[in-house]
Amino acid sequence: MDFTLDQKHEMARDLFKQFAETEVKPLAQETDETEVFPAETVAKMGKYGFMGIPVPKEYGGQGCDPLTYVMCVEELSKVCGTTGVIVSAHTSLCIDPIMTFGTEEQKKKYVPDLASGKKIGAFGLTEPGAGTDAQGCQTKAVLDGDEWVLNGSKCFITNGKVADVYIIIAITSITEDKRGRKKKNFSAFIVDKGTPGFSFGTKEKKMGIRGSSTYELIFEDARIPKDALLGKEGRGFPIAMHTLDGGRIGIAAQALGIAEGALERTIEYTKERKQFGRSIAQQQNTQFKLADMATRIDAAKYLVYAAAMKKAEFAKNPKVSYSVDAAKAKLFAAETAMAVTTECVQLRSEEHTSELQSPVPIS
């Protein structure tokens, strides 16, 4: 696989990096401390086209490949984890399933406003009793005439309260096989904010990424049109799994950016920090640690970029699967982010106790 970036990719990265440094980084600390969604920054990203990078131009997007999108999330996350995950959840978990499974009418209705950033997207699968066990979901949708009636709740939803468009997975029927074993049949729906019966519950208090709006979604006899069904009835689980494949690449890019940002800040610090008459960057023990972190980050980057390129192949040939590539990328990039940020805190010694000196882009 060729990892050489062409001129367009390099130019895109420069744009993302410049925006991150000038528009995102100065507000990152405040975003984390106040736990307020960075609405102005998101609006600016919409104007720059960051909210619809992989969306075809005919639907208002930039028409770029998955790798360009990954680089955007990566560069944003170097300075602010919050901003990176906002773009990731919006694009991978809301726009992508509409583009992949939606009707032409649904695409025209929702995608242009999502791609421009005029509207924000979210995805609701996780429930209090259904995390890794996605089939444990209890939220139900019952067809009543020309409307679906939703009842249930979702939790830990990124972009929760600020979103305008939600992809919701719910049970639409339960069937039995010849042995009497029951099977839940799920379907996917597009739900608009403001739908009667749709409200918000608990706002999650988090240790990091605190500017991201993470909320509980509550559905109490929420009625949505019959044509809000995304894809075919009973195909909600495959739709959710496909969506999560793309989501894993986005989160992998976020983790990669966080690790890179932490290492960059720590390298600067080690050059300034003096011990025993010289900077700690000149001490071999420090150099070993920095080298190990840089190596892990490069390995993670190759996995993340490879997954993005595999997703691009899928767009041309649906028989190509990128599920394993996405899972590997998320696993290794997330573990790398944890390992690198932990080591960076150790190198910063007592300095890490000051929020203003944090080496980790936790916002």
Describe the function of each predicted region.
Residues 1-89, 101-106, 113-118, 131-137, ...:
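Alpha-helical interface subdomain recognition
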Residues 220-239:
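Long, acidic (Asp/Glu-rich), low-complexity accessory segments flanking structured domains
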Residues 117-125, 169:
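A short, Trp-centered hydrophobic/proline-enriched beta-strand micro-motif
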Residues 146-147, 151-200:
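A short core secondary-structure module
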Residues 352-363:
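Single conserved hydrophobic/aromatic residue that forms the stacking wall/gate
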Residues 136, 194-225:
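Flexible, small-/acidic-enriched active-site or ligand-binding loops
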Residues 81, 155-160, 208-209, 245-250:
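Glycine-rich phosphate/pyrophosphate-binding beta-alpha loops
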Residues 129-132, 156-159, 179-181, 206-213:
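Short Gly/Pro-enriched turn/cap motifs at secondary-structure boundaries
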